[in-house]
C-alpha cells in the first residue's frame, strides 16, 4: 500500500449531503473574519464540527438474516412492548419498540436493520420538539419505512428533533434492501424508532450505545451465529 493510499484510508468520508452546509459555514467564517479576525476562528470551529457531523464511516456488518442490526448511532432511550403507530399499517398487535437518540455529535447516517423489501414510505410533517421526549414520535416531523423481511414486517420511524429541519430518505417503495445498507439521514439531532415482532429476543438495554450496522439489537434464532461480514 502506498503512502498516499494510507493517508486516504485514514480519513473518514464525508457524505455529499453535508457539502452545501460545510461550504456555507466556511464562507460565513471568511465573512466574519473580514469583519473581525477572531470571529473567523469561531466560524472555523463550526465548519469543522459540520464536517464531523456529516461523516460517513464504513462499518463491519455481520451477514446474518436472523439478526436485527441497529439502524442508527446513538443512545438507546426506550425499550418497550407497544402497539405501533397506526400510520405504519403494522396492525394492532404489540411489537417491540426500540428508540435510539442521536445527539448533535452522533453520526446521523441511518442504515437498514434487516434484509427485505421496502413495502411503504410514509412522511408526516410535524413539530420540532426535543426528540428524547416519548411523545415526539406522535407530534414531530417523521418518516416511516416498513420493511417486509423473512421474519415479518419491521417498521422504522425517522423522527426530527429540536434542531433537525430535514429528514432524508433514499429508499423507495419496492426496493430490495440488505442489512447495513444506507437508507437516509436526519440533520442536526434526532431519534429513530424501530418496531420489531415480539418473537425477537432482545440483546440490548436502555442506556446502551448503539452503532449503526454493527450493534445487534436482537435475534430471531438464539443458535444463529455468523462468520461472514461486509465492509460498507
UniProtKB/Swiss-Prot annotation:
InterPro entries: PS_Dcarbxylase, PSD-A
Post-translational modifications: Is synthesized initially as an inactive proenzyme. Formation of the active enzyme involves a self-maturation process in which the active site pyruvoyl group is generated from an internal serine residue via an autocatalytic post-translational modification. Two non-identical subunits are generated from the proenzyme in this reaction, and the pyruvate is formed at the N-terminus of the alpha chain, which is derived from the carboxyl end of the proenzyme.
Post-translational modification Pyruvic acid (Ser), affected residues: 190
Cellular compartment(s): Cell membrane
Residues at the active site: 190
GO molecular function list: phosphatidylserine decarboxylase activity
Function as written in the Swiss-Prot or TrEMBL entry: Catalyzes the formation of phosphatidylethanolamine (PtdEtn) from phosphatidylserine (PtdSer).
UniProt similarity note: Belongs to the phosphatidylserine decarboxylase family. PSD-A subfamily.
Protein name: Phosphatidylserine decarboxylase proenzyme
The organism of origin for this protein: Bartonella tribocorum (strain CIP 105476 / IBS 506)
Lineage per the UniProt record: Bacteria, Pseudomonadati, Pseudomonadota, Alphaproteobacteria, Hyphomicrobiales
Name of the gene: psd
